[in-house]
């Protein structure tokens, strides 16, 4: 049994070692990128575990976050990760070092977790600005506007800085349910130098702004009725 345990631990260690960014030959820019991506993915998990431990995690938020992860994963992350329909898989749009640091088969999970954290921060931001418990009782344009501005701001930042070489330029992204125009209709706005913002990559969060707000409203009202 002890030999089996040692073998199991060795296997786990080797798996972790393969994923560890420092073993992948990343340059300094890529390393910072990888650390930001993993930090963004781990943040909602760590915060959720902490709030659950403190018994302060609201059920409607838990359900909203789980739904957000699934919507992001099946709405666009899986599609553009594997280049399902008329697109390049992610490994063709980035360096070998990045493909090593964030393997393709977990890349969509990491990004979907990051998307979940973005939505959660949006909910927190709304609560901080309006400071009342009725923000998610029904649709309010003021609340939607805050969410929309936040979602679009972060996504433009991601497209221009973190994932510029993966989703910008001449990269070919797959069609996805929440990126319906694909490359067939994809006007681009040149912002700084060669950095562009494209309709295809922004459409996920344009549509998502409505979807995630309505999901939040649904679970908030449903849980509130049961109390």
Regions found by a protein language model. Give the residues of each.
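Cationic, low-complexity basic patches in intrinsically disordered or flexible, solvent-exposed regions
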Residues: 5
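Aromatic-rich, lipid-facing transmembrane alpha helices and their immediate juxtamembrane interface loops
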Residues: 8-227
